Structures are given as structure tokens and as C-alpha cells.
Amino acid sequence: MLPAVGSVDEEEDPAEEDCPELVPIETTQSEEEEKSGLGAKIPVTIITGYLGAGKTTLLNYILTEQHSKRVAVILNESGEGSALEKSLAVSQGGELYEEWLELRNGCLCCSVKDNGLRAIENLMQKKGKFDDILLETTGLADPGAVASMFWVDAELGSDIYLDGIITIVDSKYGLKHLTEEKPDGLINEATRQVALADIILINKTDLVPEEDVKKLRTTLRSINGLGQILETQRSRVDLSNVLDLHAFDSLSGISLQKKLQHVPGTQPHLDQSIVTITFDVPGNAKEEHLNMFIQNLLWEKNVRNKDNHCMEVIRLKGLVSIKDKSQQVIVQGVHELCDLEETPVSWKDDTERTNRLVLIGRNLDKDILKQLFIATVTETEKQWTTHFKEDQVCT
């Protein structure tokens, strides 16, 4: 693992990492039967951010404050970990396993040293004792890979859904992390975390001048033009801003429609050239052709920009009009996975059907992507490459 960047004051405040008061869980069948909504799906929110940004501080706040929320928190930090982690990681026969503990405010907590999937599977046995799940990633983790496991794990599919991705950024060291150069042209972890976020928390704003916060906010917006940016101190935030986001399901259709109308395209402020682009194309798309468009971008990664660089899409979101469907369809793409889902919103007879997409990624060319989408909407599967010069198709 790479060491944390910066001096000692970048680390979490030890006082913030004190282990909260714990009581053993004693779950009985009658207690669980008393809980309502046992058949409902449980939302999972991914908490990510660079080392020392304030993830553990946020989770400790949620675990100790009185907020009437029953939240299950999975701490998933590698290495030495915090005081809270050390108290929860239990060793038996030389192997670490997770132990769920219940806190005085009704929250549940455990610590794991893997991707957290097994912990969530075990957590489902306690269904009825919590309403939300927060999953912390390691500081160097790609949240896209973590998010994708909730789309592909069939056993969990009927019990949980991905609610959103929260990225915490250190206001003092954020720019340094975002501009860190990686070998072989790779996107650094901090930038990818910001690009994938639905909510971006600029933390520790009380430690830097206001001008530095503004500069960081501008840089974050240049990377991710879709996510909401909030400023915090000591990771304290209204839970309504991090829970029940519905960022990945059809319930977000109405709010997404309004949001997409105001998403600006961005210009790169960093060497990585991560930008947000958006475009509108009127008409209907055939679902199989739309899937082909997404496959070329997310899986094959075989389209080049005008500078002959392969485009890399990190996050894709939009509302599209599918031929022969009366409902608007939300399209989501993260980490080579994509999903189409009908929303409750119907197309009005007197309104022109249109497709509006927002893509976040590197080396993106709006004109080429829009041209590719138009070809996908109006022409057959084998004709799309004829709209590009041979050197514009990655091989």
C-alpha cells in the first residue's frame, strides 16, 4: 500500500477515532418480527476518499450521534486501521473475521479486511435491525469496482440496492492528491473517486483559507459536473445529504430529469484531462443499439478522440427514449457495468422525445461521442464505424 501523502496533521484526529460505546447484539426472532418492512430492499451507500480525508470521522459521527437512523456501518480500511477498527477486528485461529456490534444509538458496526461482500451477506441475517448500510472503502480503492459487485452478486440482488457513492476530499491536501502523477498514464485514485461520486464532501474547510476551498471546488467541478458538492468540518453533515439518494435506480428519474437540464460541460483543469461532457439527441434509440454504444465505450474502450487518444468513460448517466417504450429510461454506467431501467415518468404526447447523456471520463470528445450516438440511434449495428476515420477506432 502507498503511504499517505502529507504531514502528520493529515491523519484523522485521534479523538475522533475513539471507539464508541458498544453493546453485544442479542437478536431474537420476535424482535426482528416486530420490525417493519422486512421485505424491502436495503440501500447501500459507498463512502470513499483518499487516505486521511475523513471517512472514519464521518462514520464515527454517524455511529455515535443521536439521529434516529438505524445504520449498519462496515469499516473496510486496510493496514493498521483506527482505534474503532482495532476494537472490532476479531482474530480467531489466526484469521480475521467480522463481528457485528450494536451501538447505543441503534446503529450496527463491524470491521472487515476484504471487499465487504461477505459482511453484507452475513448482515442480511440481521435484516430488520437496520434501515441503511454504509460501506467504507480503503483510501486507495476504486469505488467503481466496489459498486459493481452490488450489480452482479445475484444472492444479494433481492436484498439490497446501491444508493449512491460519497467521496470525501481533504480541503488541505485534496489538490495535491488530485494532481499526483501515476505511471503509464493511469488515473490516480483520488481523481477516479471524485469522478464516480454522487456527493462530494470537501472536508476540513476550517483548516484552510476560503480561497483554497474555492480553488479546490473549481477543480472538483471540472472533474465531475454532475455530483453535488458540499463543504464540511470534521465530516459533520446532515444525513439526508448522504442517505436515500436513489442515485442508481428509477426513483431518481424525475429529479434526474431536472438535474440533467443544468449539467454544464467542463474543461480539464488537471493533467489527467478528466472532464464532464453532456449532449442531447432527439428521437428514439433501439435498445440493442444503445447497448452497443455503451459496450464500445465501457467494455471495448475502442473509440479515439481527435488527438488519437482512447476515450475512457468512468461514469455514465442519462435519460433516454427507447423505441416502443412509453416510459423514460434511466441509463447508468460504472466500471464497465451498465444498467437500463424504466422510470415512473412517461413521455408526454406533445413533447419531443430526446436523449440526454452525461459522461465523465478522460480524453472525451463531445462531438465524436454525439456523432457516435446519433449513428447508433438511426442506423444499423454494422454501420457505426463508417462515421470515423480508421485511426479513431481503438484496437
UniProtKB/Swiss-Prot annotation:
Q: Where is this motif: psi-PxLVp motif?
A: 17-24
- Which GO cellular component terms are attached? cytoplasm; nucleus
The positions annotated for binding GTP are 49-56, 110-114, 203-206
UniProt KW keywords: Chaperone, GTP-binding, Hydrolase, Metal-binding, Nucleotide-binding, Nucleus, Zinc
User: Does the UniProt entry include the keyword ATP-binding?
Assistant: no
EC identifiers of the protein = 3.6.5.-
As annotated in the record, motif CXCC motif runs over 107-110
The record's GO molecular-function terms, alphabetically, read:
GTP binding; hydrolase activity; metal ion binding
> Where along the chain is composition biased (Acidic residues)?
8-20
Enzyme class comes to: hydrolase
Cell compartments where the protein resides:
Nucleus
Q: Which residues form the CobW C-terminal domain?
A: 274-377
Q: Principal place where this protein is found?
A: nucleus
A Pfam short name: CobW_C
Q: Which domain of life is it from?
A: Eukaryota
Looking up CDD domains in the UniProt record yields: CobW-like
Name the reaction it catalyses. Answer: GTP + H2O = GDP + phosphate + H(+)
Residue span of region Disordered: 1-22
Looking up InterPro entries in the UniProt record yields: CobW-likC_sf, CobW-like_C, CobW/HypB/UreG_nucleotide-bd, P-loop_NTPase, Zinc-reg_GTPase_activator
Task: Give a short account of what the protein does.
Answer: Zinc chaperone that directly transfers zinc cofactor to target metalloproteins, thereby activating them. Catalyzes zinc insertion into the active site of methionine aminopeptidase METAP1, which function to cleave the initiator methionine from polypeptides during or after protein translation. Mechanistically, the N-terminal psi-PxLVp motif binds to the C6H2-type zinc finger of inactive form of METAP1.
Its recorded name reads: Zinc-regulated GTPase metalloprotein activator 1F
Which species is listed as the source?
A: Homo sapiens
Q: Which gene encodes it?
A: ZNG1F
